[in-house]
């Protein structure tokens, strides 16, 4: 992930993901584990929210790119209606920000990625 000053043509900061797929393969099931940002990012209050193909969801400072926090979505969940569900790859749709909440879809299984299908909500207060 890179922040660029388009007027000056300079890279202001960059953030590189660690490759953790070797350790995640047992969790990936039949899906493939790929490292990378693929879904669009979202920004609110100088914080950038981004999901990865290997199931990580993180918040970063827009000033310097430093990671503020990270949540691993590749796991099982008990949903609000009592059904079990699983998270996985974050791809296609980016985080949606409404008021003091960020919503993310985890478990996008297209193109052989790690399936599941949950919507997760994070408070940004």
PLM regions and their residue ranges:
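Extracytoplasmic/lumenal domain signature
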Residues: 1-37, 42-92, 96-125
């Amino acid at each position: 992930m890179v922040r660029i000053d388009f007027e000056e043509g300079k890279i202001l900061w960059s953030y590189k993901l660690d490759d953790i797929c070797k350790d995640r393969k047992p969790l990936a099931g039949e899906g493939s584990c790929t490292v990378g940002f693929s879904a669009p990012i979202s920004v609110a209050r100088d914080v950038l929210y981004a999901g990865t193909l290997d199931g990580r969801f993180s918040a970063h400072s827009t000033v310097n790119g430093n990671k503020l926090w990270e949540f691993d979505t590749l796991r099982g969940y008990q949903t609000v209606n009592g059904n079990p569900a699983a998270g996985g790859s974050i791809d296609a749709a980016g985080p949606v920000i409404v008021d003091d909440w960020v919503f993310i879809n985890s478990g996008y299984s297209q193109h052989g990625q790690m399936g599941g299908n949950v919507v997760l909500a994070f408070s940004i207060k």
